[in-house]
Amino acid sequence: NLIDFKNMIKCTTKRSVLDFADYGCYCGSGGSGTPVDDLDRCCKVHDDCYGEAEKVHGCWPKWTLYSYDCSNGQLTCKDNNTKCKDFVCNCDRTAAICFAKAPYDDNNFMINNPRCQ
């Protein structure tokens, strides 16, 4: 769910989730156009993963509760007993790890929406 995802981001990046709420064309609500950089691509992949969770698996990824561990910046999805919990946890885990690896460019925070056409 979105609260767990926020905490995963904090675990891997030590940044506030607000730093990612309006970044590039895909980080935050919705998304369109071409991702502006690697971090924005992470967000597009995460959006696509949530889309697959909804369409293919019938999940509600923004509300699906799951279990995970965070230790020294390492994320592990725990033994989630349903396909939705496991799938959504891995969507969020993959994105949080991707966020940690991708450079953060302040110039891509709150960018002009026409760049995302």
Curated annotation (Swiss-Prot):
Belongs to the phospholipase A2 family. Group I subfamily. D49 sub-subfamily. It catalyses: a 1,2-diacyl-sn-glycero-3-phosphocholine + H2O = a 1-acyl-sn-glycero-3-phosphocholine + a fatty acid + H(+). The active site is at residues 46, 92. Its cofactor is Ca(2+). Binds 1 Ca(2+) ion per subunit. This is Acidic phospholipase A2. Disulfide bonds join 11-70, 25-116, 27-43, 42-98, 49-91, 59-84, 77-89. CDD domains: PLA2c. It is found in: Secreted. One of its GO terms (molecular function) is calcium ion binding. Its EC number is 3.1.1.4. GO terms for biological process: arachidonate secretion; phosphatidylcholine catabolic process. Expressed by the venom gland. Glycans are attached at residue 80. It comes from Micrurus dumerilii. Ca(2+) binds at residues 26, 28, 30, 47. Keywords: Calcium, Disulfide bond, Glycoprotein, Hydrolase, Lipid degradation, Lipid metabolism, Metal-binding, Secreted. GO terms for cellular component: extracellular region. PROSITE patterns: PA2_ASP, PA2_HIS. Snake venom phospholipase A2 (PLA2) that shows strong myotoxicity and induces edema in mice. Shows no cytotoxicity in vitro. Has a strong anticoagulant effect in vitro. PLA2 catalyzes the calcium-dependent hydrolysis of the 2-acyl groups in 3-sn-phosphoglycerides. Its main location: secreted.
